[in-house]
Amino acid sequence: MIQHMRRLEVVALAMATLLVGSTALAKSEKVAFKDARLKIEVNDTDGDAGVQVFLDSDPWQWIEITDPNGRRLLRSTTRGSFAKQGGTELFMESGEPSFDEVPLEEFLARFPEGEYDFRGEGNDGEEFFGTATFSHDIPDGPALVGPHEGGALVDPDNAVVEWGPVDPPNGSPIIAYQVLVVLGNTGLPALPKITLDVMMPPTATSLAVPPGFLRRDTLYEWEVLAIEEGGNQTLSSSFFRTAP
């Protein structure tokens, strides 16, 4: 009987060791981020620049980003109820001081070209990892053909915005133009702006605004962003008013 009990103890210990080992293995599992991007956005109209971060993963407890020199640029950690849920997607944009305050050359020196490492820990202990290639290939701002602020009133049912093509920066192809038409200051806290946001192919130089989107006798801002292959983008913006 005693020998039988000892055998059971040995079996139980072996099973416990196996379970602990399996749990440790699961907790050290390495999982790639679903999305990990870092890009520059230049505002050619206002004369400023900033960096944007995008990432996506299963729920995480913390994430961090380091630059090509190994310096940590960002760390985000969940706390309280958020820690119980975990984080998933994250979008963050740096401040955008004007070029009078921080010239473009100084801005680029703060964020060197190269590989930026993304790391994190998941809710179940898994290790998230990813890499974003960051370049200084910055496109010019699109030349806006029209309509322009102070110009003729725009028919809200037949509105077309136009821009000129942008040359590839340092040979990096333009892959798309993002076009936004924005009604600001709606007065609704849950919907402060109403935005038409369309991604156009690199061959496009105009967009017809869908009838029914624009209100009459209303001021709108519109932007066009030229996006190069690495993700960097430069925008130009203007305003127009619709006819009564």
Place the predicted regions along the sequence by residue.
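Solvent-exposed loop/turn segments flanking beta-strands in beta-repeat/beta-sandwich domains
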Residues: 54-74, 167-192, 218-219
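Extracellular fibronectin type III
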Residues: 128, 227-244
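Extracellular Ig-like/FN3 beta-sandwich strand-entry sites
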Residues: 111-115, 217-219
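Long, polar/Ser/Thr-enriched low-complexity segments
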Residues: 27-102
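Short, compositionally biased P/S/T/A/G/V-rich stretches that sit at domain boundaries
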Residues: 27-43, 132-166
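Conserved structural position at the C-terminal beta-strand
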Residues: 120-122, 226
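Short S/T/G- and acidic-enriched coil/turn segments that sit immediately N-terminal to beta-strands
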Residues: 196-197, 202-210
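Beta-strand-rich modules
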Residues: 212-232
